[in-house]
């Protein structure tokens, strides 16, 4: 009798544990972005490259509401004069498509190591070759590797750090080593 109770309790505990794991996985997937994009920023990515110790990471997501949410974290500089998404393939300069420091919700703050800025924008914030288009059009350009983030400073008015944007999910799907594909990805939080 006791062994039957123990077996039932063990099965119940296992079922609850599995249910909890599945629930957390589903919740994580529900909260996952429609398109997670990321770019690693450095002076070596500038065209032409610039000497700087500054580096950074830019992250973009498309929540269900049709806007694009972003977070840019930079170390080694705190004096950004401008930050944009530009159109252009790797190694090419292109037109500004979004001004990241002047969106209606943009916030920036200096940190002990650099600066962070974040916010979100909608179709109406798109300019240049994206003017009149949608966030989904911008996401398609990001998917094809045709966009980059550029952060400008007084010392480097054409850009101090730059990073090509890519779809993290597509990169992970194309990777044979899923551990390497997901290392360093962080979720945007306000």
Task: Tell what function each PLM region has.
Residues 22-83, 87-190:
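Metal-centered catalytic cores of metalloenzymes
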Residues 10-25:
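Bacterial N-terminal signal peptides
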Residues 1-6:
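N-terminal secretory signal peptides that target proteins for export/translocation
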């Amino acid at each position: 009798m006791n062994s039957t109770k123990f077996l039932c309790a063990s099965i119940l505990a296992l079922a609850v544990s599995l249910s909890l794991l599945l629930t957390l996985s589903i919740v994580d997937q529900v909260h996952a972005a429609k398109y997670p994009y990321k770019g690693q920023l450095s002076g070596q990515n500038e065209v032409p490259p610039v000497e700087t110790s500054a580096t950074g990471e830019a992250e973009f997501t498309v929540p269900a509401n049709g806007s694009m949410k972003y977070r840019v974290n930079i170390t080694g500089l705190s004096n950004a004069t401008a930050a944009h998404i530009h159109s252009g393939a790797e190694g090419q300069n292109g037109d500004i498509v979004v001004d990241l420091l002047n969106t209606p919700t943009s916030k920036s703050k200096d940190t002990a190591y650099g600066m962070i800025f974040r916010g979100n924008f909608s179709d109406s914030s798109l300019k240049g070759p994206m003017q009149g288009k949608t966030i989904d059009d911008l996401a398609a350009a990001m998917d094809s590797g045709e966009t980059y983030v550029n952060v400008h400073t007084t010392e480097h008015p054409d850009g101090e750090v730059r990073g090509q944007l890519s779809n993290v999910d597509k990169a992970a799907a194309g990777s044979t080593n899923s551990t390497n594909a997901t290392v360093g990805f962080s979720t945007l939080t306000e």
